[in-house]
Amino acid sequence: METLAVALQTEYLNKGATLVTQTKTSIPQQNGLPARAEAPKIPVLSLEEGYAYFEGRIVPMSAAKVSIATHALHYGTACFEGIRCYWNEQQQQLYLLKMREHFQRMENSWNVLRMRPKESIDELCRITLELVRMHGYRSDVYVRPITYKSSRTIKLTLSTLEDAVAIYAFPMGNYVDINAGLSVCTSSWRRANSNAMPVRAKVTGAYINSCLAVDDATATGFDEAIMLTHDGTVSEGSSCNLFVLRNGRLATPALSEDILEGITRNILIDLAMQEFGMTVEERRIDRTELYAADEIFMCGTGVQVSPVTSVDRRPVRTGKPGAFTMQLQQVYLSACRGENEKYKDWVTPVYE
């Protein structure tokens, strides 16, 4: 793969790959309904650019295609991860954040979906590192591994199907504005219960629950949705975990609140304790506690650490990003970029 990587990297760079963006068009107000707020530009990688790991090989993105008869396409029988790479300009180095932990979590998802792909976690880490390295990225990057039921059948089953892994990467900066503050709403769509849908696994089919919530939120002018459990307590954002600071105490919904066991969430719990001497409570949080919070922030691979400035059109205190949130964000990003020796074991350097 080493020789292939060099050749493909040269070809890719000579092509002068560019990042494409797409924007949803605003829909004017009709029949008394509010207009859909214009969505932020979301980075999209052209399928003619770059390379991917697909069916056991490194291939051009344009060749990484599945049949319309693929089981995962019909029934959502796939699981995925999102891994960020952070560029350090001073060190001229790109760092993969918690790569092994992401694949270990994917392995947990495999168990839920009765998957047995041929690649081991060690092999997937090596493939990911090589795939990112061969592109020669000198900016922040997002890596998307996905494992899916690749058999071509309409049968409702899991155990008897073939499994395949694919990985691709593309440049991506901030998914949302992490400094401005998010306007969020509590969604009418409840978070899927763990007894009905395995929310601790990142199963693709389960994300229709999130899509419904965030689409309704953005259609009515909000940036994000907060989802409640079937008991009415706070669960998480559409695709991110949530923290509440009140009276100097930091709290986050417990794992039993139908949340994804977030890797960023775990990092922030560690940082809050080690850098700020705080005790983090993992517990049930009532909806009204959001209205009484001193600070709220969301976290995840996509949103990173993003302050929330209003909930259901009620300002969070001053309606501006909280001081603690922004300090925690700064410490987090410093660790992600390999600037803090104490947390160097969290990151994997891409370039030798």
What is each residue range found by the language model?
Residues 4-119, 123-130, 153-352:
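Helix-start/capping segments and mature chain N-termini
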